[in-house]
Amino acid sequence: MVQARDSKWVLREPSDPEKVDRLATEVGIDKVLADLLIKRGVETFAQARSFFRPSLDNLHDPFLMKDMDVAVERLHRAVVSGESILVYGDYDVDGTTAVALLYSFVRRFTDKVDFYIPDRYDEGYGVSFKGIDYAVESGAGLIVTLDCGIKAIDKVEYAASKGIDMIICDHHLPEDSLPAAVAVLDPKREDCHYPFDDLSGCGVGFKLVQAYSARYGVPFETLVPLLDLLVVSIASDLVSMVGENRILAHFGLKQLNENPCTGLQAMINLSSLEPGHVSIDDIVFKIGPRINAAGRMETGRLAVELLTSRSLSEAMQIGEKINESNNERKNIDREITQEALDMVQTGNCLCNGSAMIVYNPEWNKGVVGIVASRLVEAYYKPTVVLTKSNGFVSGSARSISGFDLYGAIESCADLLENFGGHVYAAGLTLREENLPEFARRMDEYISAKIETEMMTPVIEVDSKLNFACITPKFFRILKQFQPFGPGNHNPVFLTENVYDAGTGRKVGAGGVHMKLDLIQEDQPYHQISSIAFNMAEHYDHIKEGNPFDICYSIVENYYRGNSSIQLRIKDLREREDICGI
């Protein structure tokens, strides 16, 4: 694949030395680690204790969320009266885990509960008229939507006309008007003063469950087994790993590693992961894509069936199907990505200025979001990938750091049939005759708003570090910064003037990666294992014994039951290329 332009390394300003010294002394840690804590807003011993020891006692009161009282009361009325409940969610990981979580909880109290996942190709994203018709046919009196519904004004009206109440649980940005549902739970509502507004869709569903349990005497500890579903949502939907999300993810990972639900146990087995050592990265790169593949290639209903399965044998059968879908998805993804790259390189795309817009009516709608991400990796500019589905042009958009692509799409709302999403990722649908004007206006808007420096990927370096500092104790404390994610990334370090110890080799299909044992000149016996993905173009320079600089994160590598410290190199510069940082 074509590589994005060279990254700019930006070394963050060190924290106040007095604060660093004080915190390092109080907590008994290395100054580098104290500096990292202060950069995360942790400046006192008490704050450090809370950071290193997340507690479920620190979760916010769910009744601080607007409409929670009425939502809980309406759900309880349905449960005790034997009214049929339909749990409705999006087909992606966040939606299917949310549906699995709420469905699993509600079925503890009633068997009058069903779930519905819209078909990506037939119905598209969000609440559909077909889904409401399903609720009518199945006799449901209450629909609870998860990870969707905040814009479903007409669908809520239609449901009401059929005698069906709706509770909306969403985390997307609402428009000026809200649906006239019984309750609208969304921490991003302007009139909602919930203290944390970056919950995932599944997170909003969990707050409903938490509130229901508190109101009606369900012990909180019985909710802990649901947290493995929630951490999969938090990691896969890339919400911030701070505040309440970090607490929930911490205990969700614990549940996932110690006693996962049968569906996630099947995913762990099929992903060839080390039981008991599943990380956020494993969710993002192994488990999440497999669950997503169900909705991309077949039906998201399969994912919920997997995640609510009560027997491992059944879960493994469903998991095998999903695994096959994921393999098919990867093949199609590769083919379409190459076709899209060819279109860009031959100038055969709708737009390739400040933005990139490519369109092929034959592409599989289920993978266009992935392809958009690949193009951003390759060219580092806001990208829209479009195909044709059900007579409309539809697709996905992905942005670069610092640029609000959702705002650009919103500026073309008059040309669109539907759109939704976040600042950095969105989906849209439009009529084919509007495509040229959409491309023109998107490019015009983005050209006017984007800043030149945004077009160069930036690697933020937290601190310079000598290899001598990377001791078992240092790494043991660093691990307690987990779980990592947006807002609490795995720290990035810079070490200058390093060498390969002589054992470096190319690895991976086609030899595009490198496995190196690194040393610094003044510490030739202190070797550290490292992995550099897609950087084999530097291999000759390194094998000739030349020095280079690296920025990297420190990770724990598990292999055949053994663990070791490994550097995951994010970028590498040959010494003659260094112009200072």
Regions found by a protein language model. Name each.
Residues K66-P179, V184-L185, E335, E339, ...:
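N-terminal small/polar loop signature for handling phosphorylated ligands or for N-terminal nucleophile
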Residues A48-L59, E83, R108-I117, P187-R189, ...:
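Gly-rich Lys/Arg/Thr-decorated short loops/hinges at beta-loop-alpha junctions or inter-strand turns
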Residues L37, D90-D92, V144, D170, ...:
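Divalent metal-coordination and catalytic microenvironments
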Residues V384-S399:
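Short glycine-cluster motifs
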Residues E137-A140, C148, I153-R296, G300-S309, ...:
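Functional cores that coordinate and move charged inorganic groups
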Residues M1-S81, V232, K286-K321:
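Cofactor-/ligand-binding subdomain signature composed of acidic, glycine-rich
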Residues R107, K112, V136, R246-M343, ...:
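Acidic, two-metal ion nucleic-acid-processing modules in DNA metabolism proteins
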Residues T346-A372:
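Flexible, glycine/threonine-enriched loop-and-boundary segments that flank and lead into catalytic domains
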